Amino acid sequence: MARLADYFIVVGYDHEKPGSGEGLGKIIQRFPQKDWDDTPFPQGIELFCQPGGWQLSRERKQPTFFVVVLTDIDSDRHYCSCLTFYEAEINLQGTKKEEIEGEAKVSGLIQPAEVFAPKSLVLVSRLYYPEIFRACLGLIYTVYVDSLNVSLESLIANLCACLVPAAGGSQKLFSLGAGDRQLIQTPLHDSLPITGTSVALLFQQLGIQNVLSLFCAVLTENKVLFHSASFQRLSDACRALESLMFPLKYSYPYIPILPAQLLEVLSSPTPFIIGVHSVFKTDVHELLDVIIADLDGGTIKIPECIHLSSLPEPLLHQTQSALSLILHPDLEVADHAFPPPRTALSHSKMLDKEVRAVFLRLFAQLFQGYRSCLQLIRIHAEPVIHFHKTAFLGQRGLVENDFLTKVLSGMAFAGFVSERGPPYRSCDLFDELVAFEVERIKVEENNPVKMIKHVRELAEQLFKNENPNPHMAFQKVPRPTEGSHLRVHILPFPEINEARVQELIQENVAKNQNAPPATRIEKKCVVPAGPPVVSIMDKVTTVFNSAQRLEVVRNCISFIFENKILETEKTLPAALRALKGKAARQCLTDELGLHVQQNRAILDHQQFDYIIRMMNCTLQDCSSLEEYNIAAALLPLTSAFYRKLAPGVSQFAYTCVQDHPIWTNQQFWETTFYNAVQEQVRSLYLSAKEDNHAPHLKQKDKLPDDHYQEKTAMDLAAEQLRLWPTLSKSTQQELVQHEESTVFSQAIHFANLMVNLLVPLDTSKNKLLRTSAPGDWESGSNSIVTNSIAGSVAESYDTESGFEDSENTDIANSVVRFITRFIDKVCTESGVTQDHIKSLHCMIPGIVAMHIETLEAVHRESRRLPPIQKPKILRPALLPGEEIVCEGLRVLLDPDGREEATGGLLGGPQLLPAEGALFLTTYRILFRGTPHDQLVGEQTVVRSFPIASITKEKKITMQNQLQQNMQEGLQITSASFQLIKVAFDEEVSPEVVEIFKKQLMKFRYPQSIFSTFAFAAGQTTPQIILPKQKEKNTSFRTFSKTIVKGAKRAGKMTIGRQYLLKKKTGTIVEERVNRPGWNEDDDVSVSDESELPTSTTLKASEKSTMEQLVEKACFRDYQRLGLGTISGSSSRSRPEYFRITASNRMYSLCRSYPGLLVVPQAVQDSSLPRVARCYRHNRLPVVCWKNSRSGTLLLRSGGFHGKGVVGLFKSQNSPQAAPTSSLESSSSIEQEKYLQALLNAVSVHQKLRGNSTLTVRPAFALSPGVWASLRSSTRLISSPTSFIDVGARLAGKDHSASFSNSSYLQNQLLKRQAALYIFGEKSQLRNFKVEFALNCEFVPVEFHEIRQVKASFKKLMRACIPSTIPTDSEVTFLKALGDSEWFPQLHRIMQLAVVVSEVLENGSSVLVCLEEGWDITAQVTSLVQLLSDPFYRTLEGFQMLVEKEWLSFGHKFSQRSSLTLNCQGSGFAPVFLQFLDCVHQVHNQYPTEFEFNLYYLKFLAFHYVSNRFKTFLLDSDYERLEHGTLFDDKGEKHAKKGVCIWECIDRMHKRSPIFFNYLYSPLEIEALKPNVNVSSLKKWDYYIEETLSTGPSYDWMMLTPKHFPSEDSDLAGEAGPRSQRRTVWPCYDDVSCTQPDALTSLFSEIEKLEHKLNQAPEKWQQLWERVTVDLKEEPRTDRSQRHLSRSPGIVSTNLPSYQKRSLLHLPDSSMGEEQNSSISPSNGVERRAATLYSQYTSKNDENRSFEGTLYKRGALLKGWKPRWFVLDVTKHQLRYYDSGEDTSCKGHIDLAEVEMVIPAGPSMGAPKHTSDKAFFDLKTSKRVYNFCAQDGQSAQQWMDKIQSCISDA
């Protein structure tokens, strides 16, 4: 029995406490006056009576009622029912104006009778009967307001003394004594919540989806806040949400109605369910981590910072469907043509229970089998039960499910386990459901009818729980008279006689004590165990669980114990791979356990090594999210298997398996300990007959595959708990002591196990104390290039591991601390006495000390073991000039994140891991070794890359499955898209590793470029003068002086600059080296007085410089394009608008530009320096290319200087005599003049082009929108599109502001395209004056900054060469590639280039002035030229393009590639690589337009970062001149300095067609227009391919074939036949070499045949030329075919310059009809096959059936010429040659086309002295051939031979 009401309280308005703001309430009276012993009086009740604040009112308000919930310190709920009414106030002296609602100032008078103060009657109870409380308080109010003749004292006394029976379904009829008759209906089970209709109301208010979101939020411990205008609705909503959680109980702050004064509680860090009134909703919307539900508006708001976990599928879908069927039954039939009569919803109380039934079913499915994962630790005196969370998640298949993981870790579930864990207790609806109905729920999930039926059955039970008696007795409660609260004269609530109430309460209590207690005996029973845990998805077992893999593991273990070493070696790699699967790992522990039982635990050294490797492989994959079963099963085995090292010294397996993170995971030890204790407690209560189990720690009741034994631990516990009350005190005490001693003994046992696994064998190398979890790209990196990678986080083990605060040296103390912490936790939870815990604490240090002492002997003896035979270190093949710096360090090449070489699911051999050595040479870092897997064979694995390409190097700690002594490792990443991840062998000391790393750094960042490998190949290295050195290098000093003198003569040097050079003579190189980059402008000032001398006045030294400059690619390209002549030349026959100036020949104008520049003819050299000031780094606009078709020009420059920057620059460097303003204005004026000169010259070109006879494509023929986007609105008023669209298109935006919109321009400008378009940065174009823009247009462009390019490159590397396999299955290669943002950057570059190309094609010139002018500018200008000019798509042209646009125009190769020490921190920026990738994209779309193939691009991409060549070493021609590498001066002692990549490519191209594109067949189109959409771009295989057989092929291809490091060379000398079949592995072999294309294969075959025949090898180009000519001669069936195959003729014309001949000469008159045949060189090479056909038809070169000289008449000029004719019966041809000795066939006649051979008569021009019978005609289907023989006999002979051939055919 329990009291209906604990306290009755009267709370009123407090007039005595003055307040500036809200009023206050005070307790006027309370009953009883003393607290009950079992229930304290609730504090702060006056706040909760008026949650909106105590306020006076001018209106008579209706009485209100709501229920407030208070929670005490013991987490007990108190339900405070508040009935509030308003009394008229008489005395207002204590009130203030601000406290009165709706106060009106009427003549300054206040009407006292109009003011009302609230008063609350509060009833506090621990029971929840809201309707009873409403009736009781209403009755007291009725007696007061209607002045009934009833004593309030008796009512209150009866209320406080009324007792109510506990749950059980009984009824209680009572009366307070005011003519009332009330009935209390108790529920059947007090564990089931009572909801009335609140749940149904909540769904009606918020909807299904919103309530499910709130449900998940509460279960995953988020903060939930309701707001509504109704306090009672808030109370109902909170109760409804909490009741949905059943069987879980909410254990965080639960405040359905929060008072205004306590709103700061919402900032609490703990989760909560709180309700507030809607008037405060503006205050709560600022909360960042609170989910807010608006009950009145039906919405919820989830902040962005909250990731709300949702129910796992399929449960989420099933729950939504079930709720929809219940709440919206008409939805299913809404679309029916003939819907049934509207089915009425269940009444609200039943609907409420149906919704709750759905959630009850949900929890039954969610917690299915939970009892099988309970771990029983103690039974007596109180059950102690632990839940094995990881086992449950693992077996449910929800290890990675966020929702269930959070639920199981929450406080609510902990309470669930402690309440429902005991196996003997009272059961309720949920216990029956989860034990017996889960299978039914699963079967019915796809049958809505059955599902609804089950839901309604459950709803009936829930309804019956709240309403057990259907026939309710009659109730009567008087209500107040209607409108009683509006009466004018109502006396205040009377003061109640407290003494009288107290007296009546005492009487009632005494009366109740005498009455017999109606106690309900709680019915306890054994809780049914229910079905075992099963996977929620019923997934099919994975591929690893196949019986075949388990058989491999079993066989391998059998071979080990039978000492069959050879069979073990064969099966071990397969067994290790199989151990990736959970079933195989379980199989291993079972098999090893069997061998322990058979007393086969003593192993020899080889067996011990194999067993350790298998154990390590098994433990490697036991993550913290797994069930820990495998590691727990291995735990006793590690102390069972051992080997004898010496008499009395044995080494156990645990010494070799310590380096796994699971041993430092306290959660693992706790779970395993509780399992062991459960087994021991079970054994304790089983009889000897039943106690028949294996000695090692089994977990039978955890594994679903095992059969349960007759009695589980829970069964025994239920039996013991049932018998416990019947046992005597002594027996009970004895059982408690037995259990405690069991736990204590297990604690000692586990302390020993932990010591075994935590104390390392070598105590000087405490690995566990300094091991961190294997990191990824970002963790703990020692980045070479930059340390700016965000989030370098060194991950550690579980925070409870005990090692986070330990020192590396004190092993014993750290181990003791860890074990002590574990012992404290488990023993306290298990109820072990403090004395036992203290004794354990004293015992642990002694155990650790003894173990360390024992291990010293083991360690000493283990070092005396003979070393395991290790693979022989293979010496790598070296390149010419390459030297080994560090001899090979023995390492293991570990697999990284790429799966290709690891076998596994992708198939193929397991090449990695590979054992070998890591070498450091002067050029490369190189690994060479052999695969560890014996079955792969004797394959050599090579992985290498140039040292200069290293972008990142970091130390790592690797979990290695092969050798336990290889842990410390190194991970090195290369910009050539390669990664070396190695673990060092135990023989490699840390000191050697440090030396290796220092040497690596030394060669990665050399002191100067002469230390790089480019200058190492047998070359003499020029000395660089450093500041501290005393020696002087004459050549450098002379050179420096030459530069200084030249600059002085040009008038370009200030006094300060001269002084600097005088002081530091010969240190120009060092000065450049000390500057990390051109971060400042060239420190050269301009003098207006002097001008540059013309070329006629050049001195001797300058003339030699000029001679060398004109040999450079820039000048040669200028000449090719016809861009003017050197200034000063007097031999100009026609006016030229551009000239080549030599003003920068000494690089005084701009250091990053070439020596010769193309500028407008009208501009004087003297004004160029002033113009240059207006541009970044003095990079003024110069012409770099001319479109030969349209005559338009492409110009480039640096970005414009901002006004402030220009002013600052000029004020610093201007001479004192010149005022700043005048100098600034002079530069500005010069810039205007220069731009005007450019415009004039460009416009002239445009006019010339317009007047010429060339037809130009009109603007409307352009691709849609180009001109529309380039014309501004000012130029073409009618056009809806502004020129800004192109900028927006390039910037990836839709809208942009237009710069040129003045009315002046609208009137002035013509409606035509501009002569010049300036593509620049939006921020800089604003500085330009509008007057400049009369005939030019500014196009704003946005582009990726260098930092974005760097970040994208890092992500691209992470995608292409990941260091580890991603743990998240969603992170695929393609997703990582997409996230890198690499393709959008390529798209932006190509899009800009295509637009510029189209503009140039259509008659307008373009100036590109972006950034500094050497990154994106170089990419765009070179790509534009490649698209527009076919010459640049040849090998020679592409070389010229790169030399001109990238090398001469000053791309910062050194800085962007971090090639030198000064650039170390700048990071790698792949600007040139992006350009090559863009070329690759174009090549993919136009494969026939390029003379070079894709391998050529890969070759350049590899070697521009390799430092193999000097070409890409420095940042400008100026620096190359400083270092003496710009010109190859033949006269100097050092004949050559370094190797040039173009020379190497030239040699390679002459030797073989390695760079040649066989498809090359250019079409005469205006410009290439590739599709630049991201979807059209392809990934470049350069990023992902590798060749493990030899390493990258880009180095070896330069050598002659005899130098190739090929494995086939070893077999060449073997006698006997060999099979030609060979397996090709894509990641191992170079597929292009092992499976060459048909043409390459034929070329190599011909070369072999030449070698066999001892013939002089013919150049492949000549052979290719003859082949293509021969293909041209093959007759075409029609004209269209002939038109389509015109390409071979162009092939010959586009051959490189060294083999160009006069191939396209006019044919002679006698051969006019055979024009194709004339395109052939004549040479004196000996006779050989002329066509490919002959290689396969005959052993002889040709089949000559009949041959001789015949005169043949030409088809065009009708001339007669003698030719040598050969009749070939085999090929059915009549071929002809120039002479009998000629090997090159000039043409042939196909005899299949011959219709007849007839004699003919003589014709004009025939040879003299020829018989008339010597003439005959050959008629074919196409034409008639006229022949003349030497005489009639010969003619007849020819006719007979030809006729016989035709007849035979």
Swiss-Prot record:
The modification Phosphoserine is found at residues 1127, 1279. CDD domains: PH-GRAM_MTMR13 (cd13339), PH_Sbf1_hMTMR5 (cd01235), PTP-MTMR13 (cd14589). Residues 1674-1694 are annotated as: Disordered. Residues 326-427 form the dDENN domain. It comes from the Eukaryota. One of its GO terms (biological process) is myelination. Residues 1108-1584 form the Myotubularin phosphatase domain. It is a peripheral membrane protein. InterPro entries: cDENN_dom, dDENN_dom, DENN_C, GRAM, MTMR13_PH-GRAM, Myotubularin, Myotubularin-like_Pase_dom, PH-like_dom_sf. Keywords: Autophagy, Cell projection, Charcot-Marie-Tooth disease, Cytoplasm, Endosome, Guanine-nucleotide releasing factor, Membrane, Neurodegeneration, Neuropathy, Phosphoprotein. Residues 1743-1847 form the PH domain. Widely expressed. Expressed in spinal cord. Belongs to the protein-tyrosine phosphatase family. Non-receptor class myotubularin subfamily. The C-terminal domain mediates homodimerization. By mediating SBF2/MTMR13 homodimerization, indirectly involved in SBF2/MTMR13 and MTMR2 heterotetramerization. The GRAM domain mediates binding to phosphatidylinositol 4-phosphate, phosphatidylinositol 5-phosphate, phosphatidylinositol 3,5-biphosphate and phosphatidylinositol 3,4,5-trisphosphate. It is linked to Charcot-Marie-Tooth disease, demyelinating, type 4B2: A recessive demyelinating form of Charcot-Marie-Tooth disease, a disorder of the peripheral nervous system, characterized by progressive weakness and atrophy, initially of the peroneal muscles and later of the distal muscles of the arms. Charcot-Marie-Tooth disease is classified in two main groups on the basis of electrophysiologic properties and histopathology: primary peripheral demyelinating neuropathies (designated CMT1 when they are dominantly inherited) and primary peripheral axonal neuropathies (CMT2). This is Myotubularin-related protein 13. It comes from Homo sapiens. The lineage of its organism: Eukaryota, Metazoa, Chordata, Craniata, Vertebrata.
